[in-house]
């Protein structure tokens, strides 16, 4: 099965990179988070993620160093590849760290449900009995 450009005829050149990063993450544990894929691909730096989690950035996209069309492609490829591996999409929960009330964190400037879900979903390897 070819993934990437939607028409089944060409493979997105970013797909092999996503496949490699997903394999690396799965070698360390059963969960793939798109945010971790973006960090490992150096699309966003760890210190920016920590600033966002602490409330220092109003939304995660503010710290992203790459173009948003590339980020969108990477999120889509991550989702497609993880589902092709049989990983189960599970809602991720991201809340502000630190003292005080734990507010949900925003990923995108717009805050629309589709964008938020693309960033926050986790893909989990099914448990085999």
Question: Predicted segment positions?
Answer:
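Intrinsic-disorder-associated interaction segments
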Residues: 7-11, 15, 64-71, 112
């Amino acid at each position: 099965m070819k993934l990437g450009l939607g028409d089944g005829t060409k493979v997105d050149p970013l797909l092999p990179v996503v496949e490699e990063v997903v394999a690396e993450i799965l070698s360390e544990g059963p969960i793939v988070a798109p945010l971790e894929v973006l960090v490992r691909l150096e699309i966003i730096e760890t210190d920016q993620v920590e600033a966002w989690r602490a409330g220092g950035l109003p939304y995660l996209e503010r710290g992203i160093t790459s173009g948003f069309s590339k980020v969108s492609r990477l999120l889509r490829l991550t989702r497609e590849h993880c589902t092709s591996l049989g990983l189960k999409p599970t809602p991720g929960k991201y809340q502000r760290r630190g003292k005080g009330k734990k507010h949900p964190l925003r990923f995108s400037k717009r805050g629309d449900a589709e964008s938020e879900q693309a960033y926050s979903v986790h893909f989990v390897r099914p448990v085999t009995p």
